[in-house]
C-alpha cells in the first residue's frame, strides 16, 4: 500500500484516494450529512479528515486550471487522478512520486502514451454529459465504454470529480473559464430518441406513389390491371379464324371445341361477351374460290 499523504497523523493511500473521489462524485448535495456519507464510504477516515482532504483537493484543482502547473502524467489506469502532479502537493506526496516512477519503468511505451495527461476536449466533455445523463453517477465504466471511448473509467471518474467540484465551487466569479462550465448538450433532451433521417419519409412516399401509378387501371375494372381483366373475361362461343389459302372456308375452332349440337354452316345467335380483337365469330359456311395464277407459255 503506497503512502500518498500524511497530515495530522492521517495517512491517505491510493485506495483511500479513489474511494474518496467516488464518494465525492456520488454525494453532491450541499448538507452537513454529505461529509458523513463520504466518511462512511472511506474506511478509517473521520469527517474532519474528509473535509481537510477536500480543501487540499480544491486547492490542487484550482492551481491546475489556472495554469500554474503542467498537466500531470497518470501513474496507472487504476489510480490516475487530476491532482497527482501538483507541485504544491509534491512535498506531501514525495513517496508517491518515486513509487510512480518505478512502476512506469516496466511499462510499455504505448501504455505510457495512453496515460499521458492530455486535456479533455469539449467534445469529450459533451459525451461525458450524455453518458452521465444515461447511466448516472458512479457508473464510470459504462460511460467510458459507450460514450467517452478515448478515456479510461478512472479518467472519467477523475473528470467527474473535477466537474462536480467546479459546480459546487463558491468563487464562481473569480475562476477562469473551463469546459467544466458546460452542463448541458444543447437545448434538447438527450434522452429523446432520434427521429428518422431527413428525406427518408419523402423517399418512401415517392416510392409508394410510383408503385401505385405504375399499374394502369382498366375502364370499368377499378384498380384491377389489364392482365387480370383479360384473364377474368367470361368465355364466349367458339371463335373461328380466317380461312387459309388452299383450305375450305369452314372455320376452325381456336380456343374452345365446338358444342355437339352445332354444325358447320349454321348461323348461331350472337352472344354478348368479350372477344379477342381481330378474330371473326359466328360466320357460316362460305365458299372460297382459289384464283389461279396465270402461267406463261413458251
Curated annotation (Swiss-Prot):
The keyword Zinc-finger does not apply. Residues 201-215 have a biased composition (Low complexity). PANTHER family: DUPLICATED HOMEODOMAIN-LIKE SUPERFAMILY PROTEIN-RELATED, MYB FAMILY TRANSCRIPTION FACTOR. Induction: Induced by salicylic acid (SA) and gibberellic acid (GA). Triggered by dehydration and salt stress. It is found in: Nucleus. Transmembrane segments: none annotated. Pfam families: Myb_DNA-binding (PF00249). Residues 68-118, 182-245 are annotated as: Disordered. This is Transcription factor SRM1. Disruption phenotype: Increased tolerance to salt stress leading to better seedling survival and enhanced seed germination on NaCl- and KCl-containing medium, due to a reduced sensitivity to and reduced levels of abscisic acid (ABA), as well as a reduced induction of stress-related genes. Altered leaf morphology, both in shape and in size. NCBIfam families: myb_SHAQKYF (TIGR01557).
Amino acid at each position: 500500500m503506497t503512502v500518498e499523504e500524511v497530515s495530522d497523523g492521517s495517512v491517505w493511500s491510493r485506495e483511500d484516494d479513489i474511494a474518496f473521489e467516488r464518494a465525492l462524485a456520488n454525494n453532491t448535495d450541499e448538507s452537513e450529512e454529505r461529509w458523513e456519507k463520504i466518511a462512511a464510504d472511506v474506511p478509517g477516515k473521520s469527517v474532519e479528515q474528509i473535509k481537510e482532504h477536500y480543501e487540499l483537493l480544491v486547492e490542487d484543482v484550482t492551481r491546475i486550471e489556472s495554469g500554474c502547473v503542467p498537466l500531470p502524467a497518470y501513474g496507472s489506469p487504476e489510480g490516475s487522478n487530476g491532482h497527482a502532479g501538483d507541485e504544491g502537493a509534491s512535498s506531501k506526496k514525495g513517496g508517491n512520486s518515486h513509487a510512480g516512477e518505478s512502476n512506469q519503468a516496466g511499462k510499455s511505451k504505448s501504455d505510457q502514451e495512453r496515460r499521458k495527461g492530455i486535456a479533455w476536449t469539449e467534445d469529450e466533455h459533451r459525451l461525458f454529459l450524455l453518458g452521465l445523463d444515461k447511466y448516472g453517477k458512479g457508473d464510470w465504466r459504462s460511460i467510458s465504454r459507450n460514450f467517452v471511448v478515448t478515456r479510461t473509467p478512472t479518467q472519467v471518474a477523475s473528470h467527474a470529480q473535477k466537474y462536480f467540484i467546479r459546480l459546487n465551487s463558491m468563487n464562481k466569479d473569480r475562476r477562469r473559464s473551463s469546459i467544466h462550465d458546460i452542463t448541458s448538450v444543447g437545448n434538447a433532451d438527450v434522452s429523446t430518441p432520434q427521429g428518422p433521417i431527413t428525406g427518408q419519409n419523402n423517399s418512401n412516399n415517392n416510392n409508394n406513389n410510383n408503385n401505385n401509378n405504375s399499374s394502369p387501371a382498366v375502364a370499368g375494372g377499378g384498380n384491377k390491371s389489364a392482365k387480370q381483366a383479360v384473364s377474368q373475361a367470361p368465355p364466349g362461343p367458339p371463335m373461328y379464324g380466317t380461312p387459309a389459302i388452299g383450305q375450305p372456308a369452314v372455320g376452325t375452332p381456336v380456343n374452345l371445341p365446338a358444342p355437339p349440337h352445332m354444325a358447320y354452316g349454321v348461323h348461331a345467335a350472337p352472344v354478348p361477351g368479350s372477344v379477342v380483337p381481330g378474330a371473326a365469330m359466328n360466320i357460316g359456311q362460305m365458299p372460297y374460290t382459289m384464283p389461279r395464277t396465270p402461267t406463261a407459255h413458251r
